[in-house]
Swiss-Prot record:
Keywords: Signal. InterPro entries: Metal-bd_Tp34-typ (IPR018470), Tp34-type_sf (IPR038482). This is UPF0423 protein BAB2_0840. The keyword Cytoplasm does not apply. Pfam families: Iron_transport. Residues 1-24 form the signal peptide. Belongs to the UPF0423 family. The keyword Signal applies. It comes from Brucella abortus (strain 2308).
Length: 182
């Protein structure tokens, strides 16, 4: 009986470690930037399987999943509390391989994962090397097909939307399975 309890006591921490060890490791890209009343942080991790299928490049055809974590800053005038995810933004990216000058562009989509909502896309990189990432972030009013209302009356109104902003970062991609990669 004693051995049964000892085995159970060892199995619980081990199973928890294995469960949490399976989580994806996010690699920060530069430092978060404060722009337009928002904190804009960029990360990458291994490519992600998404639903609905076909909403972005399949994970098997991608090198990384790029993410923009965009949260309201303390000075936000649009009614969001500090740290709130800011929805309905229009986010696109430009990724330049600084070693060869090749540029690729795309759009980030809003999505949710176990660490919360963010904007992202699966991306096929142009091999290992140094990259420059530009994130172009526009307010909800930039998308004429997605409506996100804003109170403008004297009693309950919020400030006007921010002007579009650009966050720029540089990072080294070592390749999959390499130190400094995921």
């Amino acid at each position: 009986m004693k051995n049964l309890f000892r085995t159970a006591a060892l199995m619980v921490p081990l199973s928890l470690a294995l469960a949490y060890g399976a989580q994806a490791k996010e690699i920060p890209i530069g430092k978060p930037q404060l722009l337009g009343g928002m904190e804009i942080a960029a990360v990458y991790l291994q490519p992600i399987e998404m639903e609905p299928e076909g909403m972005m490049r399949p994970a098997k055809d991608s090198d990384v999943h790029l993410e923009a974590d965009i949260k309201a800053a303390k000075d936000n005038t649009n009614g969001f509390a500090e740290g709130d995810w800011v929805p309905y933004l229009v986010v696109s990216y430009e990724l330049t391989h600084l070693d060869n000058g090749k540029v690729q562009k795309g759009d980030f989509m809003p999505m949710v994962a176990n660490d919360g909502p963010h904007y992202g896309d699966n991306v096929k990189l142009d091999g290992p090397g140094k990259y420059k990432l530009k994130l172009f972030v526009s307010p909800p009013s930039a998308n004429q097909h997605a409506h996100f209302g804003r109170h403008v009356d004297k009693e309950t109104g919020v400030g006007p939307w921010f002007k579009p902003v650009t966050a720029e970062y540089e990072f080294v991609y070592a390749g999959t399975g390499k130190k400094g990669a995921y």
